Amino acid sequence: MAIRDWPEGEGPREKLLQRGAAHLSDAELLAVLLRNGVSGQNAVDLARELIGEFGGLRPLFSATKQQVCRLQGLGPVKYAQLQASAELARRLAGESLQRGAVLTSPDLTRDYLRFQLADRAYEVFAVLLLDSQHRVIQFVELFRGTIDAASVYPRELVSLVLEKRAAAVIVCHNHPSGVAEPSQADRRITERLKNALATIDVSLLDHMVVGDREIVSFAERGWIG
């Protein structure tokens, strides 16, 4: 049944306007973003199918274009709508660590990195640049793709740190497998970066590896030293 044929006030947009977004289900909120359905499905039914197909909102919003567009009736426009919404949500979360914000606890950093990096279908290597008071200067994605000792160039990090005049950094990356346990390659990369930063008197405070349910801190394991 088309949403326009539903009882008055039961459509997701009308319900949102009358009762507030908190009263909508995940599928109803997603339907508002999608705006319309596809042949044979209204927007709410389509939203339910998408959430079920991908196993939740996080994997859906981090899915690739190919993964989304392989579903019948979906194309680049729907994918663009999902990506725009996900990026807005990331930027909103990022406001908690805007320039000048102080990292008061590891949990704050974990929450931010979890939202930025968890459930991505590809690896992202990034850095949090901090001043001498551990206030945030900037969060920068250095590159995307398979991360190994050959693909991480210490000179690029050093150049960025000098450009932004950072006094300390936290590096981080995700494991698309969902398992956060660091590899030996991760430990070797960390040692190389720490040594490179030491040549310009900048501290590597931590390397955090983001998985689906856990974020491993090198500092907490005593691996930074």
Curated annotation (Swiss-Prot):
Q: Does the keyword Signal apply?
A: no
List ligand-binding residues for Zn(2+).
173, 175, 186
InterPro entries cross-referenced by the UniProt entry: MPN, RadC_JAB, RuvA_2-like, UPF0758, UPF0758_CS, UPF0758_N
Record's keyword terms, sorted: Hydrolase, Metal-binding, Metalloprotease, Protease, Zinc
Looking up PROSITE patterns in the UniProt record yields: MPN, UPF0758
Superkingdom of source: Bacteria
Coiled-coil regions listed: none
Q: Which residues form the MPN domain?
A: 102-224
Pfam families, sorted? RadC, UPF0758_N
Motif interval(s): JAMM motif: 173-186
Q: Name a biological process GO annotation.
A: proteolysis
In the record, the note on similarity to other proteins reads: Belongs to the UPF0758 family.
Q: What is this protein called?
A: UPF0758 protein Sama_0327
